[in-house]
Every structure is written in C-alpha cells, then in structure tokens.
C-alpha cells in the first residue's frame, strides 16, 4: 500500500491545488477543520475518513465551503476515496439548497459516479425552477456513458417529467427502465404511476400498478391520488377498500379519500370516511393538520358548514390552509359576512396568520356571491397595498365578475382591457353572462362574444366543449326576442359540430347515488318521476308560476310548448322529483349539478321548497344554493 503523507502547515508545502480552490481559500479554515498534526499523523485512508466525519458536522454552506477547500488542498482528485468525498459535498450542498454550488462541484470533477449524477438529478427534481434540468442531466448521463443509471436515478427523473407534464419524455424514460432491468422495482414503478397519473394517462398508470410484483403504501396512494385528481372518485374509493387488505392508510391516503368524497358531493360517504379516520387510523394521522384541512374542505363541498366549522374549532393546531378552507367554504355557500369575519380573526394580533393569494380569492368570491362591490374593491386593493400580493388571473376574474354582475359592465370591460395579462375565456364569458342577466344591449354582448366564440381558449376552458359562449349569446338573443339570431347561433353550432354540454344532476339516497341527465328516461323509476313532475308543474302553476322560455334558447324557437317541456325535464328537476318520491317528508334533498342552475330552475326550486315544505340544497358548478320556505340563500344573486 502506498501511503501519502498529508502536510497542511505551512500551506506552501502542499503540492496539489485544484482550480476550483481559488476563491474558496479566502475563508479561514473553521475551528471544526484543524490541520493534520504532522506528516505521519495518519494514512491517506484515515485522512479521508477524517474529512468525511467533519462533513457530517457541517451545518451550513459556509462550513461546507471551508471543508471543500480543505479537501481540494489536501487530497488527490483521482483517488476513489476523494471522489467519494466529492459526492458527499455534492449531497450536502444540495441539501443546503445551493444547487448552483453543487453544479460547480460537479463540473470540476472529471469522472462522475452514478451517485454524483443521482445527487444532482435529485437536487434539480426537488427544485421547482430546475425540473427540466433534471431531465437534461439524465440525458447527459446517458450520452457520456461514464456510469449507468440505477434504481435511484429513475424515480427522480420521473418526478421531474411528471412536474413538467412530460409524457413523451416519461415514455422514453420508461423504455430505459425496461432496458436496464428495473421494471420490477417498487420505487421505480411508484414513479411511473405518479408520472402517468400526473399526465392524465390513468390506463397506463393502472397497467403499471396492476403488473407490479410487489406494492408499497406509496403505490396505493399514488394510484388513488391519480384517480381522484382526474375525477374517477368511485374508482378511487373502490381501490381504497382493496388497499385495506394489505396496508393501513396514512395521512396521504385519507386526504385522497376525503377529496373523493368531496368530489362526489356525498355527505354520507364523507361522514363514513371521517368515522373511519377516527376509528381505524393512527392517532397521529387523525390529528394531522393536512388531514383536518381535507376534512374541512370535504364538509364544505358536501354542504355541511356546521361540521366543517366543528372540525376547525376542534383543531389543536391550524395553518393558513385551515383558515383558507373555511373562508372558501363560507364564500361558496354565500355566507360572505362569516367569510370576512374569519379573515378578520385570522389576521388579528392573537392569531397573526398572514394571508396569501388563495385567501383573497376566497374573499373576492364571497363578495361576488353577495354583490358586495365596495368590499370586493377594498380587498383587491388591500391585497396589493398591505400584503404585496400581485393579482393573478383568478383574482381579476373574480373582481371583473363581481363588478359586471352588479351592473357596472363598462367599468368591468375597462378593467379587463387594463389587465397586465391576457384575459382568458372564463373572464369573457363572465362578462357575457352579466350582459345576459342585466339586459345589456345586444350590440355590446355581440362585441364581447367576438372575443371568445370559436377561439381555442373557449374550447379549452370548456373542457373540450366550446358551447359556453354560444349558449350565453343565444340567451341574450332570446331575452331580446331575436329568435332569428337564436336560429343562426344554433346553425353555427351545428356546422362546427358543437353541442351544449348536457346537464347532469345526482342525488344520494341510502348510500346509493342516482344520476340524471336532462330528459333522462333510463332510470327504473322513470314513470313515477315523470308523474311527479306533472304533479309539481300543476301545483306551481296553480300559484302563478309561468316558465321562462328564454332559458331554453336552443330548443325549437317556433314551439313554446317544446321549450316549456324541455325546461321541465332539466336534470335537477328530475333529481328533485326522485327525492320527493323516495325520501321521507321534510327530509332535506341534496342535489349535485355539473352546470350552473338556470333562472327558471332556480325559481321553480324556490317554489317547490315552499309548496312541498322541504329544504333543497343544490351544489352547482359555481356555488351552493340552500332553498327553504320559498327563498334561496343566494338572495337571487348568482
């Protein structure tokens, strides 16, 4: 064995200097890094071990840089033990979030081990601004061929691909995984499930999941999360039931399960999930802040603000997301005063929680649903003035909708034109909707519609169905009795293969969800439902109800009877009729609808709540409506 003595004092006796050490030696060596006592104090191996031990004590970048300088001055770079030390320095600089320094260290090394590549790829994968660099590093690793990727390489490359929605890049990595023989590795497969799930390729994610020779809890969580993220709520809950045969759920599992219940709008399922959490989960899981926040969101979205507030009040520890969940919950239920009161509590000296952009979205929604224009303007200004939060597109969308729906359409248009970013289809449609509700001139409505109809943005923001603006414009024409123009809109939609998104409403009875589409005749109780609709119509007409035919603009304009019949068969009316047949008298009827409630159905539901003496809760695309005794919680402002 060749032993090299290390002489570190005086500095002039050191025989090797690395170029990167220039600029590092301006820092005096830390007391944590004393020089070797004499040339014969240790062997080279002991010296490397000594430096490695010192590396374990580094607590910040200042100490690490001094250690790096010491390593450069007292070791030979070609020694395997030195390369191992460089890998440790890479790892520490990454853990101290100094990725730029990690790159400098990496670039100063001639031959890189798999560990070095993996360390830098991992650092980039964890840094939001450098996700793409992680994939580029992986490609460079393959091109150089210094070392092969291993099972530690792929999970972080896949994580980076998932973040940038790099489906094609991810497929390439998948091929490399198979080529290098890691197709059966549980950690690699977890990364593939996360990748495909993030890109919306649920079939591929499920294929990887089903073919795994072994699964971890992360495997189940990743698959359940992917299903929930893309609206496959029933499948997610079914997979959760299967998971319980092999694993105990953790906090991540329960967050996904509660999100699935919220997505279904099922209060009974949400209550079951809450009971499961308390009965079968570890105490730490049940008390976890993130899980509690998911509980609050679930109860808010399932229509029970009382339970949401009960969970909130029972929390021993709250974070900003806890407050935001309650503010958004009150906002979507039209309880603006409570939302604003919660905000005041949140920012007072006792709680001293600093709001973020999500907080102000909730406040603006609250003001929007109650028509509090001045308060909305105050919060919009406060966000910038007091908290230095730059308004995003979502904030502008809220304030524009608030101002326009209050009747200040010209002011809303001026704000849209002065926005620092391009308005999206949602903003233009909110202006068009305000024109429809406020009886603005047809000419102004047409001018607004030209900014959106037929554009790519309208198509994308309508979930692939670009009917939104067409339907709104047709309602403007219908309200003005311009039926020829309504016909032109219908013809344009037909020529472009555009159809109105079908309304769909669901109601849950005895744990079973029943789904209805507009004009549906597929339910086993269709005959009784249609008979009940006739009873409802007769009783409402007896107290003066007249259908608002302008709410069915796309139905044959020459046949008023067809329009009235079409309105009677809207999906929420079928669901309400079904509820009246199958629920005990005076039991609240809970409806979950995919579209915004139309004016006529809103009026009808108010009357049903009075005539049949029942509470009806409708969650539509925008908000909750609580109908009782002939009135609605929205105060007819939605």
Swiss-Prot record:
Principal cellular location given in the protein's record: plastid
UniProt keyword annotation of Membrane present: no
Gene: PCMP-H51
Transit peptide: 1-40
Per-repeat ranges for PPR: 82-112, 113-148, 150-184, 185-215, 216-246, 250-280, 288-318, 319-353, 356-390, 392-422
Similarity section: Belongs to the PPR family. PCMP-H subfamily.
Gene source species: Arabidopsis thaliana
SUPFAM superfamilies assigned: TPR-like
Pfam families: DYW_deaminase, E_motif, Eplus_motif, PPR, PPR_2
Any single biological process term in GO: mRNA modification
PANTHER family the UniProt entry points to: PENTATRICOPEPTIDE REPEAT-CONTAINING PROTEIN
Assigned keywords, A-Z: Chloroplast, Mitochondrion, mRNA processing, Plastid, Repeat, Transit peptide
Subcellular location: Plastid, Chloroplast; Mitochondrion
Subunit structure: Interacts with ORRM1. Interacts with VAR3/OZ1.
Miscellaneous: The DYW motif is dispensable for editing activity in vivo.
Protein name in the entry: Pentatricopeptide repeat-containing protein At1g59720, chloroplastic/mitochondrial
Region annotation Type E(+) motif: where it falls in the sequence: 511-541
Domain of life from the UniProt record: Eukaryota
Gene null: resulting phenotype: Impaired chloroplastic NAD(P)H dehydrogenase (NDH) activity.
Function: Involved in multiple sites RNA editing events in chloroplasts. Involved in the editing of the site 2 of ndhB (ndhB-2) and site 3 of ndhD (ndhD-3) transcripts, which are two plastid-encoded subunits of the chloroplast NAD(P)H dehydrogenase (NDH) complex. Required for the activity of the NDH complex of the photosynthetic electron transport chain.
Assigned GO CC terms: chloroplast; mitochondrion
